[in-house]
Amino acid sequence: MARYIGPKCKLSRREGTDLFLKSGARALESKCNIETPPGVHGQRRGRLSDYGTQLREKQKVRRIYGVLERQFSGYYKEAASRKGATGENLLQLLECRLDNVVYRMGFGSTRAESRQLVSHKSITVNGQTVNIPSYQVKAGDVVAVREKCRNQLRIAQALELCAQRGRVEWVEVDADKKSGVFKNVPARSDLSADINENLIVELYSK
């Protein structure tokens, strides 16, 4: 299945919220009315059934992290097989993806750009080049930009944007060396309250 490459605004309008798919330097334009669904009948956001609400929440989270349907289903199965709350396990698995960690550290301005950095072999984990965006980063891992890629302007700009919005507490970054430590897997309380993972659990439990 191909990855979506269309307008980012359309996805945010579909979910009715900013999915942070664009960098801070190119935030959603004023003309992108996220309160209005896309399409010719966009003015009518119909009332959703319980199933529809659950499905929309799954799609929202899937799009935030840039994960395809089959991948997302695999993450859910892995989360359900682990001890603890399935929904929290799911979010933690998504947060530990290498492309997401690169984004959290500020090396990429968006998760899509961070995924590209990983795929283009611009990122190392514990000194070894890793080009798999879904690679699971573990607590204590050192994630860095490869030396030959450190002078890229987009990385410097991404780090500046990250410094402006504030970096998450579970990573520690040396912006000059373009290297960081994934200190720990974030707890549910550390993550966005705008996500209702219980709806996703209900959807997959049907």
Swiss-Prot record:
User: Which keywords are on file for this protein?
Assistant: Ribonucleoprotein, Ribosomal protein, RNA-binding, rRNA-binding
- Tell me where the transmembrane regions lie: none
What processes does the entry annotate via GO biological process terms? ribosomal small subunit biogenesis; translation
The cysteines joined by S-S bonds are none
Q: Which PROSITE patterns does the entry mention?
A: RIBOSOMAL_S4, S4
Q: How does it assemble?
A: Part of the 30S ribosomal subunit. Contacts protein S5. The interaction surface between S4 and S5 is involved in control of translational fidelity.
Function description? One of the primary rRNA binding proteins, it binds directly to 16S rRNA where it nucleates assembly of the body of the 30S subunit. With S5 and S12 plays an important role in translational accuracy.
| Annotated protein name in UniProt | Small ribosomal subunit protein uS4
